[in-house]
């Protein structure tokens, strides 16, 4: 079994590991000839992240047979954070079943792999009625504006207009969107849709990935999970699913 993957810089891998760490403590990656993937759900089954990292995104990539390898995310993250922005990161697996991590030219780590306890998690199959495509920086700012007054984000669309809002004990906020606004690429809706989602899950993932993503796509339907797609040039795609808030 031969497996090795080398990045040209550290930012993309840092973004991936940071995003995964917002949901799980242990992660099982799947490596094939096509690339590396990860899919995991938080313990409460509220959020799910699905990552596909194609072989073309790596400076060097080799995998002659499909393998799974599990790591403790906090330990892996500590190693990755030792890399400077321009440092390459190379990972491989030794015959002793250790993860070998080379950071830059002279830092070589060994990390013990863990037994995979992950089960195959199917992706939600949902016909979405509404879509908003906007810049990651604009979305991050909107989340910050809403979090001032609320722990939840409500998204509403109607035709080619939409709004983000939040309400809490201290007050409320509504941020209107128009398709001609700066940072907005598309607002479309087959029918009026509204959904409310937890910022506790949403904020960390957007902050983790947002710096490496240009535009993000939010898709939702009334009372259905939110689906966010991050397109990152050197990663491929990251999909994040978040269950709606259920009013008691």
UniProtKB/Swiss-Prot annotation:
Keywords, ordered alphabetically: DNA replication, DNA-binding
Amino-acid biosynthesis among keywords: no
GO molecular function list: DNA binding; DNA polymerase processivity factor activity
Disulphide bond pairs: none
GO biological process: leading strand elongation; regulation of DNA replication
Keyword RNA-binding: no
Domain of life (superkingdom): Archaea
Function per UniProt: Sliding clamp subunit that acts as a moving platform for DNA processing. Responsible for tethering the catalytic subunit of DNA polymerase and other proteins to DNA during high-speed replication.
Assembly behavior: Homotrimer. The subunits circularize to form a toroid; DNA passes through its center. Replication factor C (RFC) is required to load the toroid on the DNA.
Family under the similarity heading: Belongs to the PCNA family.
The protein's name in its UniProt record: DNA polymerase sliding clamp
Organism of derivation: Nitrosopumilus maritimus (strain SCM1)
Gene that encodes it: pcn
